[in-house]
Amino acid sequence: MVTIRLARHGAKKRPFYQIVVADSRNAATGRFIEKVGFFNPTAQGQEEGLRLDLDRVNHWVGQGASLSDRVAKLVKDAQKAA
């Protein structure tokens, strides 16, 4: 089953997440099909906290991909901001 989920990157105590489309059987930070954005929870000031390609997200959801709980909330926030 294909899911759109967060893959953690960054340094210790400085999380940075790639939003990826991946097979649910693969490891959380392992192989993925496509990157569709990023999420930086520690963004301050002028730093970009969220970038999401909503066209690609909608494409994958149309193909049957499921969203993780956190990504679903981020997509909702991105759609509200757009």
UniProtKB/Swiss-Prot annotation:
<dbReference type="InterPro" id="IPR020592">
    <property type="entry name" value="Ribosomal_bS16_CS"/>
</dbReference>
<protein>
    <recommendedName>
        <fullName>Small ribosomal subunit protein bS16</fullName>
    </recommendedName>
</protein>
<dbReference type="GO" id="GO:0015935">
    <property type="term" value="C:small ribosomal subunit"/>
</dbReference>
<dbReference type="InterPro" id="IPR000307">
    <property type="entry name" value="Ribosomal_bS16"/>
</dbReference>
<dbReference type="GO" id="GO:0006412">
    <property type="term" value="P:translation"/>
</dbReference>
<comment type="similarity">
    <text>Belongs to the bacterial ribosomal protein bS16 family.</text>
</comment>
<dbReference type="GO" id="GO:0003735">
    <property type="term" value="F:structural constituent of ribosome"/>
</dbReference>
<keyword id="KW-0687">Ribonucleoprotein</keyword>
<keyword id="KW-0689">Ribosomal protein</keyword>
<dbReference type="GO" id="GO:0005737">
    <property type="term" value="C:cytoplasm"/>
</dbReference>
<dbReference type="InterPro" id="IPR023803">
    <property type="entry name" value="Ribosomal_bS16_dom_sf"/>
</dbReference>
<dbReference type="Pfam" id="PF00886">
    <property type="entry name" value="Ribosomal_S16"/>
</dbReference>
